[in-house]
Amino acid sequence: MAKVVGIDLGTTNSEVAVMQGGEPVVIPSAEGSTLIPSVVAVNKNGERIVGRQAKNQAILNPENTVYSIKRFMGRKWGEPAGRELPVEADAKRKPYKVIQGNNNEVRVVMGDKDFSPPEVSAMILQKLKSDAEAYLGEKVTEAVITVPAYFNDAQRQATKDAGAIAGLKVLRIINEPTAAALAYGLDKKKDETIAVYDLGGGTFDISILELGEGTFQVKSTAGDTHLGGDDFDQKIIDWLIAEYKKDQGIDLSKDKTALQRLKEAAEKAKIELSTVQQAEINLPFITADASGPKHLNIILTRAKLEQMVMDLVDKSLEPCRQALKDSGKTASEINEVILVGGQTRMPLVQQKVKEFFGKEPNKGVNPDEVVAIGAAIQAGVLKGEVSDVLLLDVIPLTLGIETLGGVSTALITRNTTIPTSKSQVFSTAADNQPSVEIHVLQGERPMAADNRTLGRFMLDGILPAPRGVPQIEVTFDIDANGILSVKAKDKGTGREQKITITASSGLSKEEVEKMTREAEAHAAEDSKRKEEIEARNVADNLAYNAEKTLRDNKDKIPAELNTELESKIAAVRTALQGTDVDAIKTTTQELSTALQSVGSAVYGQQQEQGAPAQEEPSAEGKKNDDEGTVEGEFREV
């Protein structure tokens, strides 16, 4: 049975895991690490690179290196931001170019092309898929992907689109805190109530769950999709810019290369300050003026960092209060607090969580790996590899429609267990009204204009009647992924209209299919390029070894073989100057054959020149330790 992988598609880093022998295993990348930076770039040669390699070249190529793309998933220019930073403001913080596309969707520029956020996320997913296939030795076509619990419908749909573009059938979208709870509670036997405090690179979630007898029931969830490690880094960056401007009179915020260096230095200092009291930020040649090169050297203490980010940590506690209130629990009723996300390693975060819940947080899970592990467990549940587990998740935001006066009328309130369905009867607002527009909304605000529009559709053919008489039944259906379908039916005529909110990510079905084809084509190009590089490396190494053999054994190689070998080496060198991979492979094979002939000739000459005969074994079957030929295994390096 084909394996289904679990993927934690993170803002800063991503991971992939799988069930093996009944246990979840985090899969290492081709580079050897389980954490893959969520970074994509197009280098100066026009090549697309992903992960650690992309992150390593970011300083030299800031304008074509995209990071934190998750913050733009499912977002549009000019939409109500709620707790989130408006797209326009977030775009200004990035050294890469963020532009407004058709229908106000977000696009990012790399090289000479612009891409949608799902396309960029798909590149990260393709890297994870490729690493998983290399590890498992088989094709991977299905996945469970995690999202922040507080992601709205558009952000969830954008994640599904990214999976499709990457060539993955997304069996389930699962909330990150719920995945973490699965990983924590799979082998727990006792009933308990837990809080999952998930502060990652770009998002914050808090979920309250009840665990018992293999059932994981989410009671409430709250969060902020624009609060995470990126914001902590930004505080340090802003401080460094201000300090440098005060000291040197130079504004580093205008220099994209300097900004990228500041970002990396800020992240490094922040991580260091989780274990030490002060960190030195030393950036030589950060900029230059008329007097010559300028350097940056500043000491940042843990105390200063905590002052800078205190408001961010406090900001995470408001959703915690909301989640407790919605669950009907008090802090004292929480048995365990699970910390998830790399930012929870910060001592200040741990201290604040301890003070809020009145207990020491549980540090028994790896905050970086626990979400991917939970996703793999959910994949195992869906495939029947894991039994006796029931997961009951909830929707994070209220769903409703616009009614008379621009009011948002709720049909399904937040924290309702999914999958679910809810119907409600509405009527017309005017006499003889022939049609109604169903304006589908998501959010907690009382007025429609302040909430997010998920979709609109018309129900026509309503029979003439006084206002308030026609009965229009509106039904909301939410599947286990939290994806919404809406149906409107005129009970008088039986006329019906329905919509599945699939384009709320900003991409139509046709666009997703087109991007999928492009991604497949690019994967084929990558494979071809890799094949060419490997062929070139083999050819170059073989030609080098052949040249060395000629130099070292010139007096031992017969003249005709010498000439043939020189000819074959020249053929390989000529092929390497071109782009024909088949020619490189053919000439390499011919050179290999010629080299074997030379080897046989040299060894034959040595034997003819009187090599001592091999002694027969004695009656006891023994022979001298240093005699005879020892067969061994050799491998190409």
Swiss-Prot record:
SUPFAM superfamilies: Actin-like ATPase domain, Heat shock protein 70kD (HSP70), C-terminal subdomain, Heat shock protein 70kD (HSP70), peptide-binding domain. Transmembrane segments: none annotated. The modification Phosphothreonine is found at residue 203. InterPro entries: ATPase_NBD, Chaperone_DnaK, Heat_shock_70_CS, HSP70_C_sf, HSP70_peptide-bd_sf, Hsp_70_fam. It holds the Pfam family HSP70. Keywords: ATP-binding, Chaperone, Nucleotide-binding, Phosphoprotein, Stress response. Residues 619-637 have a biased composition (Basic and acidic residues). Residues 600-637 are annotated as: Disordered. One of its GO terms (molecular function) is ATP binding. Induction: By stress conditions e.g. heat shock. HAMAP family: DnaK. This is Chaperone protein DnaK. Belongs to the heat shock protein 70 family. Residues 604-616 have a biased composition (Low complexity). Disulfide bonds: none annotated. The keyword ATP-binding applies. Signal peptide: none annotated. Acts as a chaperone.
